[in-house]
Amino acid sequence: MQMIRAIIRPGMETKVIECLEKEGCISLTKMEVFGRGKQKGIHIADISYDELQKTMLLMVVEDEHKDRAIKTIMESARTGKYGDGRIFVTPVEEAYTIRTGKPGL
């Protein structure tokens, strides 16, 4: 299993989630977050915004669905401009459903 954390523009979340659903990636957690990338925020004239609002999508997928989920996020979240976001992937050793106690997804 793989955990995918995608930090995307807030305005792209609906499109990204709809595209993921079409690809069969339905289960996810969505959080509103603030952060900055290499550009250290946005600088417009004399005004600086050090942290920008983003949306973080968190999902755990089976190994065979990882590449499809990443491709879907990249294609649906990309504008080609700075601030499109990042995707982080980490292995998940175990997962359990709290209600049933059963392991796995």
Swiss-Prot record:
Transmembrane segments: none annotated. The lineage of its organism: Archaea, Methanobacteriati, Methanobacteriota, Stenosarchaea group, Methanomicrobia. Pfam families: P-II. Keywords: Nitrogen fixation, Transcription, Transcription regulation. It comes from Methanosarcina barkeri. One of its GO terms (biological process) is nitrogen fixation. One of its GO terms (molecular function) is enzyme regulator activity. One of its GO terms (cellular component) is cytosol. Could be involved in the regulation of nitrogen fixation. Coiled coil: none annotated. Belongs to the P(II) protein family. This is Nitrogen fixation nifHD1 region GlnB-like protein 1.
